[in-house]
Amino acid sequence: MNASRLPGFNDTSQDQPYPTSSEWFDGSNCSWVDAVSWGCNVTINGTSTNATSTDVTSFVLMAVTSVVLALIILATIVGNVFVIAAIIIERNLQNVANYLVASLAVADLMVACLVMPLGAVYEVSQGWILGPELCDMWTSSDVLCSSASILHLVAIATDRYWAVTDVDYIHIRNEKRIFTMIVLVWGAALVVSLAPQLGWKDPDYLARITQQQKCLVSQDLAYQIFATMSTFYVPLAVILILYWKIFQTARRRIRRRRDPPPPRPTSADGATPSGRPVQSARDRRFVKKRFLNLKKCNQRTRAETLAAALLLTEGQSTSTVDTLDEEPRTTAFTINEKVPPSVSPEKSSSTVTNGSKPERAIVPAPTHREKKESLEAKRERKAAKTLAIITGAFVFCWLPFFIMALVMPICQTCVISDYLASFFLWLGYFNSTLNPVIYTIFSPDFRQAFARILFGTHRRRRYKKF
C-alpha cells in the first residue's frame, strides 16, 4: 500500500510517529473547528504546517473504515460460529454431507480470526508497520485460509454432482470419503501457502516491507501463476462445469413426463372393482382429507426435490435426492393407511354412494397440463436462481482480486490504485461472510437450528408422514 496517504507516513525514511490529537494543535491558537472551516497554521513536533479539512477528512475516513471492517469481521465470525454450532447441536444436521459445510465454516472462521484483523490494521494505518515476521505469518494465513475456503466450494460442488448423477452415491457417501475430501482440500491449501516460506519469493519481498511498508504475498511470476491457477481459475472452471451439469440433469428430470394411467372403472351401481362401495358421509370426508394431505405432500416433495439436489445443506439430503429419479406424480392418490370398513382399499380410485345417487371418489390428477408446465417452469427458475446465487457470489467476490493478482507481476509498469487493491482484497474476504448465508439459507433445517440458537425455541417440525 502507498504509505503517503495519511500524515505521519509521508516520509518512510524517518522514524516519525503518527501525530496524536494533542500534537495537531500544539502551540497553535486554532481548534478543530477552525482547522476544518478555515484552515490554520499549527505546530507538529516543532514544525509549522497547515491543518486543513483534508487532514480531518482523512481522519474521518480512517474512522469509518475501521467501523466497516470491524462489522465485516464480526458478521463473519458470528455467521460461521452459528453454522458450526448448528451442526454440533442439531442431531438432524449431523450427517456426512454437512461435514463439508462445517469444514468450510472453519476455514471462513479462520479468515475472520487470523486474516481479517491484521488486514484491518494494515488498512487503517495505510502501511505495514508490524515487521517482516508478522507479514510472513499474515500472508501465509491469508493464502491458507482463503484457498481452503475456495477449494471447499469445489469439494461441495463435486459432492452435489455425484449425488445428482449417481443414484448409488448416497450408499458410498460415508465419513471416510468426505474426510478424505476435506484432507485433500486443506493439504492443497497448505502447499500453496507454505511455498513462499520455503523460498519461492521474489527478490524485492523484504525491501517492499521495510522500505515501502507494503506486505504482499510473493510477487514471483511463476508462483503467482501457480497460486492463482490452483486456487481460483481451475477451481472456478470446475465449479462452473459441475453446476451446469447439475442444472442440466435436474432440468431434464423435471421435464420428464409420464401420462397418468386411466382411472379404474366403476360398475353401474357405483361399486369399485373390488365390489366394496363407499357409502357414508364419514367415508367421503375421509377420502377427501386423505387426498388433500397427499396432494400437499406431493406438491411439497416435487417443489423441494430440485432444491435439495442443488443445495448441500439439506439435513434430509439423502432421502430427498433419491426422489430426483422419480417421475412427477400426477396420478390419483394412494391410501396407505387404515381405512374405514366401507372404504375401498384400491389405490387408484374409490366410489362414494349417497343413497341412490353414486358419486365417483376418484380424485383427478393434482395438476392439469397447463398447471404442470407452469410448476415445471417455476422449479427451473428456482434452480437457475439458486445456482446463480452460489456461483455468482463466488465469482463476484474473488474474480477482481485474482485478475489483479495475476496482472501485477506480469505488468511491472501497470499502476493499480491502493484503494482499489484494498477493495478487491476485502471483497474476496467478504466471500467468507457470505458463505454461511448462501450455503444455509436454502435449508429449512439450518434456519430452524438458527432460530433455536437465537431464541431458544424448540418448535416441532411440521412434517407429516403418510
From Swiss-Prot:
Q: Which UniProt keywords apply?
A: Cell membrane, Disulfide bond, G-protein coupled receptor, Glycoprotein, Membrane, Receptor, Transducer, Transmembrane, Transmembrane helix
Residues with glycosylation annotation: N2, N10, N29, N41, N45, N50
What is a single cellular component term in the Gene Ontology annotation?
A: plasma membrane
Instruction: Kindly give the InterPro entries that the UniProt entry links to this protein.
Output: GPCR_Rhodpsn, GPCR_Rhodpsn_7TM
- Which PROSITE patterns does the annotation name? G_PROTEIN_RECEP_F1_1, G_PROTEIN_RECEP_F1_2
Cystine links in this protein are C135-C215
- Cytoplasmic side, ranges: 90-99, 159-177, 251-386, 443-466
The Swiss-Prot or TrEMBL record annotates one GO molecular function as: G protein-coupled receptor activity
Cite the record's Low complexity compositional bias ranges: 339-353
Q: Per UniProt, what is one Pfam family of this protein? A: 7tm_1
Where found? Cell membrane
> Which parts form a coiled-coil structure per UniProt?
none
Q: Which residues cross the membrane?
A: 67-89, 100-121, 137-158, 178-200, 229-250, 387-410, 420-442
- In Gene Ontology terms, what is a biological process of this protein? adenylate cyclase-activating adrenergic receptor signaling pathway
- Biased region (Polar residues) positions are 10-21
UniProt membrane topology term: Multi-pass membrane protein
Residues exposed to the Extracellular side: 1-66, 122-136, 201-228, 411-419
The segments labelled Disordered in the record are 1-21, 255-282, 339-360
Q: Give the protein's biological function.
A: This is a receptor for 5-hydroxytryptamine (serotonin), a biogenic hormone that function as a neurotransmitter, a hormone, and a mitogen.
Question: Which protein family is named in the record?
Answer: Belongs to the G-protein coupled receptor 1 family.
The protein's name: 5-hydroxytryptamine receptor
**Natural source organism:** Heliothis virescens (Tobacco budworm moth)
